[in-house]
């Protein structure tokens, strides 16, 4: 299996880490007999193509009270997708961990559903999208609940390692790119004019004058 210099460097530099963490995460499988597999598949589904996260950001964008969250999330997702999907995945072109059928990770992959992904491995797009959208919620939200946003993002990364569709270093790369995208998104969102956050995308019936007054 031929790989380019960038992918080869990742494999040689982080190979031990990738295998060690994957084996540690898979102790969950050993302890629970596959109980965690459907859970991590559901978590992973929410990051597929970023669709669920995009829909969430658009829903928050619709209402004035949550528009700052939605705006930052949309910007973060866009920045993360550009860096990850349009640049790094193409340039580095790292094969998925299950491609090497002689490796221990392939054996783990066989145990947890044999999920196949169509694009390259580094960095993790799911993890990028999770952090790019959740970091703004953490920064802008009430700290009594916003920590759960980061919990979701970290769980997404663990899910990708557990399902053996990413190396640990892929997930770390996604974490870095996603966090960067999320922070930049917050900065941009704070600099947008206040008029954007005061726009009415809809008008409730209660805001319309009664027929007797409009006649």
For each predicted feature, which ranges?
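N-terminal transmembrane-helix/juxtamembrane module of multi-pass inner/ER membrane proteins
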Residues: 1-53, 89-115, 206, 210-215
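Membrane-interface junctions
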Residues: 27, 31, 45-49, 63-64, ...
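Membrane-helix interface segments
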Residues: 33-36, 65-70, 141-148
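Transmembrane-embedded, aromatic-rich helix segments that form part
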Residues: 52-56, 171
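Interfacial segments of alpha-helical transmembrane regions
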Residues: 56-86
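Alpha-helical membrane-inserting segments
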Residues: 59, 79, 83-88, 92, ...
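Short helix-capping/hinge motifs at transmembrane helix termini and TM-loop junctions
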Residues: 63-64, 92-93, 163-167
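Membrane-embedded catalytic cores of phosphoryl/pyrophosphoryl-handling enzymes
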Residues: 106-215
